[in-house]
């Protein structure tokens, strides 16, 4: 072998030796033992109280009956403008992406004629035996997909309690015979 080949092989072996030495040294310096259980533990404070389901417990902070006692249907009409891209509210109004909401309070859920409801909404309605009472409207309008899993409604919800109460008061007014307001001292109905 000539000296140029010996120099090349020596340089290659020297480089491999240096890299291996650095690797072994850094493994010794920066060694991290394997965890007993893979993953990270995230410690977070529990939010809101009580029942599983969170959204229902949070919405129950102030019962809708108490909020409706001071709700303003005129303010609710302004909130309803968010809904008009998908819903109508006049008597005999057409269905859009969502059903017409005239006389919706106390109407059986998923029962409006001429509208094709999602499977999630039909399941939730239990064959139209569940009604849009004030509590169901309150929980649904807070977070539609959380209250009715599988609903096709793409609206994120109305987070502020007072805005929801105003909107429900306005929806109540969309009727020839508005449903009576609930007793503000009554306990909220349990959600299924």
UniProtKB/Swiss-Prot annotation:
Domain of life: Bacteria
Protein name: Cytochrome c homolog
Function: May be involved in electron transfer from bc1 complex to aa3.
Keywords from the UniProt entry: Cell membrane, Electron transport, Heme, Iron, Membrane, Metal-binding, Signal-anchor, Transmembrane, Transmembrane helix, Transport
Keyword match Transport: yes
Membrane topology, Cytoplasmic segments: 1-7
Membrane topology term: Single-pass type II membrane protein
Periplasmic side: 26-192
Binding site for heme c: 83, 86-87, 153
Family membership noted in the UniProt record: Belongs to the cytochrome c family.
UniProt PTM comment: Binds 1 heme c group covalently per subunit.
Subcellular location per the Swiss-Prot or TrEMBL entry: Cell membrane
Broad class of the protein's primary localization: membrane
Entry's transmembrane regions: 8-25
A Gene Ontology cellular-component term: plasma membrane
Molecular function per GO: electron transfer activity; heme binding; metal ion binding
Gene behind this protein: cycM
């Amino acid at each position: 072998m000539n000296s140029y080949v010996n120099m090349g092989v020596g340089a290659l072996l020297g480089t491999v030796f240096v890299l291996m030495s650095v690797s072994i040294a850094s493994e010794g310096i920066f060694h991290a033992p394997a965890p007993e259980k893979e993953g990270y533990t995230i410690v977070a404070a529990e939010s809101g109280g009580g029942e599983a389901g969170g959204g229902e417990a949070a919405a129950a902070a102030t019962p809708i009956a108490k909020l409706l006692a001071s709700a303003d249907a005129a303010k609710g009409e302004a909130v309803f403008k968010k809904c008009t891209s998908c819903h109508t509210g006049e008597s005999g109004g057409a269905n859009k992406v969502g059903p017409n909401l005239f006389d919706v309070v106390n109407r059986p859920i998923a029962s409006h004629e001429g509208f094709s409801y999602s499977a999630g909404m039909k399941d939730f309605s239990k064959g139209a035996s569940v009604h849009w009472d004030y509590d169901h409207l309150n929980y649904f309008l807070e977070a539609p997909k959380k209250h009715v899993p599988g609903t096709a409604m793409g609206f994120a919800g109305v987070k502020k309690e007072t805005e929801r109460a105003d909107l429900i008061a306005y929806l109540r007014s969309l009727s020839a015979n508005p449903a009576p307001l609930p007793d503000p001292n009554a306990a909220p109905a349990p959600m299924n």
